[in-house]
Amino acid sequence: MSTYFPSSHDISRKWFVVDASGKTLGRLATEAARVLSGKNSPKYTPFMDMGDHVIVINAEKIRLTGLKSQQKVYRRYTGFPGGLREESFTRLLQRKPEKIVEEAIKGMLPKTKLGRKMASKLNVYKGDQHPHAAQQPQPLEINA
């Protein structure tokens, strides 16, 4: 008996929708990263993109535990001298709540070509509306 190696024809991708209302950021991110990488599938193969699509709605209603909501700082670098930009969690939550959830989930995926391919199947939206109703996404329950 030989080892099973799936081909690209064997992959059937599903769509899942996650409601972030009242969910803890890290717990939601780990579950979403697991589905995006395909580790929830019995046919998981590490060298192939086996993951499903994930839609996260209500990104503005995500929560953090402890004092992280006051202490957490998001940094980015422009590439110029003195170009380190810092923004607090509360400010970024008001301005771009989708960015918070995206960064948390992408940080849990591999930093390779395959990881970027997995991250492209992530869709995060502010509010409870999303344009993917035609794909008939199934709800993904996260106990957070």
Curated annotation (Swiss-Prot):
Q: Please give the start and end residues of each transmembrane region.
A: none
Report the family membership.
Belongs to the universal ribosomal protein uL13 family.
Q: Lineage of the source organism?
A: Bacteria, Pseudomonadati, Acidobacteriota, Terriglobia, Terriglobales
> Keywords, A to Z?
Ribonucleoprotein, Ribosomal protein
| Known role | This protein is one of the early assembly proteins of the 50S ribosomal subunit, although it is not seen to bind rRNA by itself. It is important during the early stages of 50S assembly.
What domain of life does the UniProt record list for this protein's source? Bacteria
Q: Name one GO molecular function term.
A: structural constituent of ribosome
Q: Name one GO biological process term.
A: negative regulation of translation
Show the Gene3D superfamilies listed in the entry. Answer: Ribosomal protein L13
Assembly with partners or alone: Part of the 50S ribosomal subunit.
Q: Which Pfam families match?
A: Ribosomal_L13
Q: Which HAMAP family match?
A: Ribosomal_uL13
Task: Name its species.
Answer: Acidobacterium capsulatum (strain ATCC 51196 / DSM 11244 / BCRC 80197 / JCM 7670 / NBRC 15755 / NCIMB 13165 / 161)
One cellular component GO annotation, for this chain's record?
A: cytosolic large ribosomal subunit
Question: What is the recorded name of this protein?
Answer: Large ribosomal subunit protein uL13
